[in-house]
């Protein structure tokens, strides 16, 4: 029968399915499959520990601890867990491959046994009776030494192996899903951290002055003295001053407008409160007149007195309503002023950002142009040979400061003819001297 050994990997991790290795004995002693990874081993997963109760899917025990705190995640811890899950996946895949190879080996053994049985049946039909008895004895001895499994047992083992494979595949799918969820959460956290870091950098760029590196990078004092460089320097200084003034004035004006809008809103609220207080005072006076003061003797009022009384009451009501309307209008105006101030603040911030970007781009372009001019000058300097008589001119005198060409004097025809005659007289003398020296050198050698 088969010998079963429990794997050490299953013993170390609590709550995991037990993996066992089964050695199967073949019918023939000389049969050894070459393609199997562990010889004739077959892995078997036992899902009958006390925790499962006979059935259930395998879930890694570390995930329960992780899902206790849903709101707080540690990125390093999540990455370590993903690495461990990937290792578990690799182990499970290797186990499934071993199981598949074991299944293939068992199928081959089963086919070999069938073929051997068929061959033995054919030989028994062909051999005589005195040899049949001898072959039967040999077969019985071989069966006693190496007992063969019945085909029913083989089919049962195959079915059990198929069930174990299905369970392992389900476990692998669960582990894949957990790993994907963890990866998604880590990605989301990384994105959130990246957005926060970008926001902090933008805030630091907005409210932090320019560092010494940028000042040294775009400093124009170290450049050679040229009219173009001086013009660039003047433009940079003017642009810097204008930019700083604009950046200072825009927030100040926005703050002033905000303060004014808040004061207007406070004034409107105070006016509304005063109107409400007057209304309450008038109503309380009427009630006090009705309750506290003793009744005066009632005399029949004339029509004029009644008309005056009604007019005074109507006038007081109209004044109160007018004050309420004015307070509402002031509140609306203050709200509009607040909206306008906020819009101006937003526009000023956008303009400030655009000005910063334009200033940076302009500085970069000017720096690139200066670099290109320096490269051209260096190329022109390298074009002259080291021993040429123009090297000192190229080193000390820039191309821009070269002297302007002067107008030549008017030369008469007589002077030009005299110069030509002098040139013609000088040239044959030089040739004659050269010939004489050459003949003297030849005579000395002879």
From Swiss-Prot:
This is WEB family protein At3g56270. Residues 313-349 form a coiled coil. Keywords: Coiled coil. Belongs to the WEB family. It comes from Arabidopsis thaliana.
């Amino acid at each position: 029968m088969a010998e079963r050994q429990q794997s050490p990997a299953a013993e170390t991790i609590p709550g995991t399915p037990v993996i066992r290795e089964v050695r199967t004995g073949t019918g023939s002693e000389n049969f050894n499959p070459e393609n199997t990874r562990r010889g004739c081993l077959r892995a078997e997963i036992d899902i009958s520990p006390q925790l499962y109760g006979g059935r259930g899917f395998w879930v890694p025990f570390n995930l329960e601890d992780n899902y206790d705190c849903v709101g707080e995640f540690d990125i390093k811890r999540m990455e370590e867990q993903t690495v461990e899950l990937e290792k578990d996946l690799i182990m499970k895949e290797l186990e499934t491959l071993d199981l598949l190879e074991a299944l293939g080996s068992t199928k081959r053994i089963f086919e070999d046994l069938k073929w051997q049985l068929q061959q033995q049946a054919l030989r028994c039909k062909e051999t005589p009776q005195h040899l049949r008895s001898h072959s039967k004895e040999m077969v019985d001895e071989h069966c006693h030494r190496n007992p063969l499994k019945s085909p029913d047992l083989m089919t049962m083992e195959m079915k059990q192996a198929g069930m174990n494979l299905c369970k392992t595949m389900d476990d692998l799918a669960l582990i894949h899903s957990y790993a994907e969820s963890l990866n998604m959460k880590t990605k989301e956290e990384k994105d959130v951290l990246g957005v926060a870091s970008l926001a902090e950098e933008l805030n630091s760029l907005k409210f932090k002055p320019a560092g010494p590196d940028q000042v040294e990078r775009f400093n124009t004092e170290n450049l050679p003295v040229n009219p173009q460089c001086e013009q660039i320097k003047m433009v940079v200084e003017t642009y810097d001053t204008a930019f700083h003034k604009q950046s200072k004035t825009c927030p100040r004006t926005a703050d002033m407008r905000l303060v004014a809008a808040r004061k207007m809103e406070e004034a409107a609220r105070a006016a509304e409160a005063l109107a409400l207080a007057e209304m309450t005072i008038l109503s309380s006076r009427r009630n006090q007149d009705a309750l506290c003061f003793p009744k005066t003797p009632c005399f029949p009022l004339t029509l004029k007195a009644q008309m005056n009384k009604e007019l005074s009451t109507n006038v007081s009501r109209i004044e109160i309503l007018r004050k309420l309307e004015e307070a509402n209008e002031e509140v609306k105006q203050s709200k509009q002023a607040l909206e306008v101030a906020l819009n101006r603040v937003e526009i000023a911030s956008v303009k400030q950002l655009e000005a910063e970007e334009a200033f940076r781009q302009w500085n970069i372009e000017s720096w690139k142009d200066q670099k290109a001019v320096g490269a051209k000058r260096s190329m022109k300097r390298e074009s002259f040979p080291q021993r040429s008589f123009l090297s000192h001119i190229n080193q000390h005198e820039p191309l821009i400061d070269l002297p302007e060409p002067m107008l030549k004097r008017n030369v008469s025809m007589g002077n030009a003819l005299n110069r030509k005659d002098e040139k013609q007289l000088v040239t044959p003398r030089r040739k004659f001297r050269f010939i004489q020296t050459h003949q003297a050198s030849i005579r000395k050698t002879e």
